[in-house]
Amino acid sequence: MPVGLACNADDVLSIAVLCGGSSPEREVSLAGGKRIADALGRLGHRAAVVDLNRESAHQLLAMAPDLVYNALHGGQGEDGCASGLLDILGLAYTHSRVAASSVGMDKVLTKHVLKSLGIDFPEFSVLTKEEVLSAKEVMPYPFVIKPICGGSTIGVHAIFSRSEYLDLSVHADALEGRMLVEEYIPGQEVHTAVFLGRAIGTMEF
């Protein structure tokens, strides 16, 4: 059952900042989690960093925070596992619910949802690691090869030429069993935050 949190702007909250974990994005998450906890402290809240591990459920229950701030990147933090755990523990948290997280973390599932909504996206195919490394032409250049689940651009390779494609063998150990191969679309990356259905700010990268 989802847990809500009602509070006033001047309330002092006990907040557990959940970060770290075991995904390839662990270090990014730890750095972000510390900055978030520091910022919450400056706002007057009681914030503590919790590094996700096997004991985290017991730790969170003992802390009984007013809110869990999900600062995890990738893996269990974004695929719905952390959301499911926090639902079971009956703790209020930031982040999407289980279903939205699990779909959003999987780039292929996300594309199927986008297609059902009539939203355009780059041409793509899903290949095994062996197919990617076979040196066969998989798509007209340029294209992008990326993990199906993952973020922070870890494991992402933009391929502009045959020689760059052949160089992928150097990264063979880091490639996943199934990879997304996607048409390269040049442009500027922008992120827009949406809260309660309202856009609250856009950043350009």
Swiss-Prot record:
Pathway as given in its UniProt record: Cell wall biogenesis; peptidoglycan biosynthesis
GO MF terms held by the record: ATP binding; D-alanine-D-alanine ligase activity; metal ion binding
KW GTP-binding (keyword) present: no
GO annotations of cellular component type: cytoplasm
Main location: cytoplasm
Gene Ontology BP terms: cell wall organization; peptidoglycan biosynthetic process; regulation of cell shape
Catalyzed reactions per annotation: 2 D-alanine + ATP = D-alanyl-D-alanine + ADP + phosphate + H(+)
Coiled-coil segments on the chain, per record: none
Cofactor binding note of this UniProt entry: Binds 2 magnesium or manganese ions per subunit.
Cofactor (UniProt): Mg(2+); Mn(2+)
Known function: Cell wall formation.
UniProt protein name: D-alanine--D-alanine ligase
Binding positions for ATP per the UniProt entry: 139-190
One Pfam family from the record: Dala_Dala_lig_C
Compartments it resides in: Cytoplasm
Every ATP-grasp domain range: 111-205
Family (UniProt): Belongs to the D-alanine--D-alanine ligase family.
Keywords noted in UniProt: ATP-binding, Cell shape, Cell wall biogenesis/degradation, Cytoplasm, Ligase, Magnesium, Manganese, Nucleotide-binding, Peptidoglycan synthesis
EC number: 6.3.2.4
